[in-house]
Amino acid sequence: RVCRKAEEAAGLPVRPCYMYALTREGRKPPMVHVRQSLYSLLEPRKKRGNVVNLLGFFSPLVDDCELYDLLHQAGVKTIHEISACRDYEEYQTMSEANFNLVLHPEARFAAEDFHDRLKIPFIELTRLYQIDKIGSQYRAFGKVLGVTFDDQAAAESAQKAVDAFKAQYPETAFAVGECMNGDAFELSLALVRYGFKVPEIYGTITAENFIYIKQLAAISPETRAYSNMEPTMLYYDGENSGVNMAIGKDAAYYHQNCPNVMWNQDRQPYGYAGVRRLFEALTEAENRWEEQP
């Protein structure tokens, strides 16, 4: 009834989206429901073979993300992101996509709705910070599309940023939080594999990230994982943690006496560009910290 009255008043389609905090740990938490509702107004249209939708985030990818170029290599002419749509009509053109690319697991239900209602299939990619795994994922993606991507320059640029930071700050020991653009456990695994220490992680264990936890346990058994939802974290004392740099807003809160990178910007880091930008940001944060009087 409320939606109908709103439609009459605004002259625009309106859909309800319920935000129940108690569903946070359930099958369809609030952010999953929001993503699903965002696309519920799309109407069927004739499909175009050179159109792709990127699903998963409420803001676009960073503009130098190599994924755009790789899609163009595959013959894609138009890449839609809901946050970049200028008006309702452009939003409706998302129904013309040949397929959807799911970049965040919380958009999976939305992609399934696309498939059921609009007959648009989807492919899911994971945001990663391990350079070799990013390459493997792109190769698998290219195989599905029947193309071989040229991602060498982007991969080398990311590796160069990692190497430059490591050469300047080889003894960095990270605290990695979950309030940032990435999975805390996957990013921690990447940092350990790059040769850094990760004494502490603050994150929520899920089915998706358990594989990273198992790998971390094998190569960095001294790493400790904490839950931000645990009330006793109010008394957390990181003085003897060995941490000298923090990634994520929560990690920065726990470790206020060392340099940090919030890494929670609106434009979404992704792929090799995400790795490169992260290590450039880490280098900049360390440099600023050293320049303090």
Where are these regions (language model features)?
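An N-terminal assembly and electron-transfer interface module characteristic of large anaerobic redox
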Residues: R1-P293
